[in-house]
Amino acid sequence: MDASYNITPDGKSHYGFLLTVGHSLVGLKGGRIKTVVRSSTEAEIVGVNEVTSELLWARDVLVELGFPQDEVLIAEDNNSCITMLQTEPRNFQTNSRHVRVKWAFYRQEHEKGILKLFYCPTDIMRADLLTKPLRGKVFRDHDLAIRNGAPMAI
């Protein structure tokens, strides 16, 4: 999962994610964050919220088809986002109500043991393809890794 902060003329941000089962890409989605966020961390939190909804749906489909699922992993390259999403409710601070609601949704699913965030270094964050222009070798490396089913981050 990746988000790009304030990249449009109207101050909006983008998010994107790749959905994999094993090492196979089975879905992807990207889009514009509808509200203006005030930091890259808030953009990432909103993006994680979008991913959470999609992952819960995909997990339910797999369970319904008879494939029991462990916790779903979400790769994140923003340490501040990871820290905020793992913060206990009494310590979470934000002035943005919409960010607090999105944080609460992730926390709810995390506390059920369904979702888990992990740090993924930016240089192997394949979702960058959906959120920002990549040049030359970086683009080709991500594209090749996705096509070959290399281990990747969401």
Regions found by a protein language model. Name each.
Residues 1-41:
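RNase H-like nuclease fold core
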